[in-house]
From Swiss-Prot:
Name the UniProt record assigns to this protein: Protein wntless
Residues bearing attached sugar chains per UniProt: N58
Principal subcellular localization: membrane
Transmembrane residue ranges: 14-34, 240-260, 271-291, 312-332, 345-365, 391-411, 442-462, 483-503
A Pfam family per the record: WLS_GOLD
Sequence ranges on the Cytoplasmic membrane side: 1-13, 261-270, 333-344, 412-441, 504-562
Membrane topology: Multi-pass membrane protein
Location of this chain's protein in the cell: Presynaptic cell membrane; Postsynaptic cell membrane; Cell membrane; Endoplasmic reticulum membrane
Source taxon at top rank: Eukaryota
Segments on the Lumenal side according to the record's topology features: 35-239, 292-311, 366-390, 463-482
Amino acid sequence: MSGTILENLSGRKLSILVTTLLLCQVLCFLLGGLYAPLPAGHVTVLGSLCREDHGRQNDTGFLLYSRGAGACIPVTREEVEQDSTKMANELVHVFQMPLPRDLRDLDYSRWQQNLIGVLQVEFGYDSSSELREPPRELQLTIDMRLAYRNKGDPDNGWKLYAHGVEHRYLDCVSSHVGPTETLYSCDMIPLFELGALHHSFYLLNLRFPLDTPSQMNLQFGHMHDLTLTAIHQNGGFTQIWLLLKTVLFPFVVGIMIWFWRRVHLLQRSPALLEYMLIYLGAALTFLNLPLEYLSLVFEMPYMLLLSDIRQGIFYAMLLTFWLVFAGEHMLIQDAPNKSTIRSRYWKHLSAVVVGCISLFVFDICERGVQLRNPFYSIWAMPLAAKMAMTFIVLAGVSAAIYFLFLCYMIWKVFRNIGDKRTSLPSMSQARRLHYESLIYRFKFLMLATIVCAALTVTGFIMGQRAEGQWDWNDNVAIQPTSAFLTGVYGMWNIYIFALLILYAPSHKQWPTMHHSDETTQSNENIVASAASEEIEFSHLPSDSNPSEISSLTSFTRKVAFD
């Protein structure tokens, strides 16, 4: 058996390969740290108060806007207070995005990919109100209308994008106590999420209808300031991200073809680890495919959901591979039968499968529904929000437990290798040098696996933390840095690229060394061969199972022949 490239590659060539890959890894971090802006940006828009014509409340095509020709005339708070009915069912809160800068109108770019809106509400009660405690889980009914227009359209050329009447629940605290009224400031609430930022300008109209028979919105005093925070992906970050994908995609495809061709040249069926490597490469290729370019031409509101699905498939495959990778090197395979996922790893992988399916269902329940109703949010209902938060926390805890279990498996691998190294002194010097070098290389690869797993789990937990709503009340811009995101993404590609190279079958054929020839080889020749930088590690005679791809996995069944 010729073994793998990891076993047979010369020290000089291996050093060049590792150095090149490490330089590429540093380049990925620098690309995000020096050239890419923050992954996301946000703008805060204070709502303008307008009064609509009587009887047009149910006309969804009637839209009010605050800038441009034909804009509505703003209504002041004093005018509302002086009105006998407080302008009930006539007030519209208008938000026009993006805001102008330096007297110049700005527009959204398709490079910004998506748009999320969250709202902060402030309202007041008269001092004569019977309210004694801050409102908790106070139901607010909102009539929401989202519209858009593009460059070149007239100022009044707004087109309705979505309309819905939704319920939100507010938790508020007292922010100001005055002689005539008490002001309350409420937690931010999710308002809408657009999976595609295809148009240049967006307009949001909010109405808070009052209805006595159904007690709709009657528990509120009167609205004060409404602040909309619009969060978008930064276009500069998207360009760097797509550049990274565009460069990495052909390299991974090419190395997969090369790897699978070498496997099929062998006179045996592919081993389990070889199958897992090609599946992992396929999942990475699907993730690398720069489909985001299509969103620059076509409106694809499902792009966020598709990105989550691609990321989920890759996570599932990567977590599965690490368990199999560590398990195949446990060096305790006493049975000669070929390993299969079902026979050896179903207990370990069942938890991974259940977790990934649960996350997929959770994602479908929110982003799948948002394809038809961008105002829908699983965080809108108190019970659903608590369940979602519990689910996210459990996902983060499960990721940490998985990492600890993987560390335990790799520790067992190291311990088993250490136990079997006691047999090295009884071997011939050539055989001992071969295995010592192989063990050193394998330990380095396992340590690289631990680092990759640690950064992956950290990124996953940070992503789940960003999904939660607990940060909105402090800082809506909390996010991983661009350097971390591009670095981890590059690390996945470099790590899998290296595995496909190092675990590809080596086709070098070495002359058979008989026992008598090996035992009579002089010590001087052995030392001279080991010291040479160009020497290839020869595969010594063994009785290994032909289905194995690494001589290290059969180390425990080797018997010293000295």
